[in-house]
Amino acid sequence: MDKIVIKGGNKLTGEVKVEGAKNAVLPILTASLLASDKPSKLVNVPALSDVETINNVLTTLNADVTYKKDENAVVVDATKTLNEEAPYEYVSKMRASILVMGPLLARLGHAIVALPGGCAIGSRPIEQHIKGFEALGAEIHLENGNIYANAKDGLKGTSIHLDFPSVGATQNIIMAASLAKGKTLIENAAKEPEIVDLANYINEMGGRITGAGTDTITINGVESLHGVEHAIIPDRIEAGTLLIAGAITRGDIFVRGAIKEHMASLVYKLEEMGVELEYQEDGIRVRAEGDLQPVDIKTLPHPGFPTDMQSQMMALLLTANGHKVVTETVFENRFMHVAEFKRMNANINVEGRSAKLEGKSQLQGAQVKATDLRAAAALILAGLVADGKTSVTELTHLDRGYVDLHGKLKQLGADIERIND
């Protein structure tokens, strides 16, 4: 079993490049199923285990997938007749596999997708996806752990008001509606940059989508879509993690590919703490020294503070003075990293959906285990400043969302190794 071992105390300096966004590439890969004419080529694709999983799902659905890892590119040819069923053996590994349902319904008029797995954080229900498909005219029923969807008269444009701005549901409905008859309106839509990237991709394929990035998205259905070449946007969560690595070690690093507009809620909090940020055309420079100020954070749907940055920000707040409160409103069960931080001598108490951090914690190296993807990164960040040696296990979580994080940190001056036991 792999582990990452960190000896804390080194300031990070230098330059590091952000990979393509995991949360953009997965829906965009599934959207490639919409192209009945010509293959699509996606570039700036991060080399992640989740990308391999979704590629396997697409192959099962009868798409030809060529993964050119050395070029960070994937070519998807979905011009043949697609299979209707995404089986449990793949879908169980990753929740994003549910995103094949929209494209399959759009292309075939029917789909069978196993109920998803792959995430330890809360229940992440799929009711909003189902609500959207039913509004578009599909009949849905659940049986033997599968979702059966059938739109025997085809999908028809409609108005859909989401109860919550679910990212996955917004993406799935956009994809289904892109080939539906007539106009679809999604109200209370998710506004993440990854939604905008998906809409841009489908528009490049010949789609007619407006309003992505706002509350209301309009999709005018078209007859068919064709493959194109598209570059995936940079990963704002990786960028944020690297900015925090610079700040937590009181270092000075340039994060190439970090886009301020994609992570405004994070950078404003960092500035409030006294972290110095310099915004350049192709990235963000982060510098920090001395004591940082306490701030409170509350996770919210975009453009609020991202839940995917909560645990990393908590690591940074442990090194700041004063009283801090971290409130998680997006997912239940997302404080599992707190118990691991406590093993490192962190002063944190959880009360319901809030974690209270008292004073500056004198972090000490310890053996800890990653409980989810972002917790893995957060524990590594804490290890960068802990006194002594920190060992982080359960790295399969980390590999789902970060490409060579330990290698990047080492290149910036961290004393860090990945060891295969």
UniProtKB/Swiss-Prot annotation:
Known EC number: 2.5.1.7
Gene Ontology MF terms: UDP-N-acetylglucosamine 1-carboxyvinyltransferase activity
Compartments, as annotated in UniProt: Cytoplasm
Signal peptide range in chain numbering: none
Active-site residues (renumbered): C119
Pfam families: EPSP_synthase
Catalytic activity: phosphoenolpyruvate + UDP-N-acetyl-alpha-D-glucosamine = UDP-N-acetyl-3-O-(1-carboxyvinyl)-alpha-D-glucosamine + phosphate
Chain positions recorded as UDP-N-acetyl-alpha-D-glucosamine binding sites: R95, R124, P125, I126, E127, Q128, D308, V330
UniProt-annotated binding residues for phosphoenolpyruvate: K22, N23
Location, primary (coarse class): cytoplasm
Pathway assigned to this chain's UniProt record: Cell wall biogenesis; peptidoglycan biosynthesis
CDD domains (alphabetical): UdpNAET
Keywords from the named record: Cell cycle, Cell division, Cell shape, Cell wall biogenesis/degradation, Cytoplasm, Peptidoglycan synthesis, Pyruvate, Transferase
Entry-annotated residues carrying 2-(S-cysteinyl)pyruvic acid O-phosphothioketal: C119
Similarity comment text for this entry: Belongs to the EPSP synthase family. MurA subfamily.
Full protein name: UDP-N-acetylglucosamine 1-carboxyvinyltransferase 1
Record organism: Staphylococcus aureus (strain MRSA252)
Gene: murA1
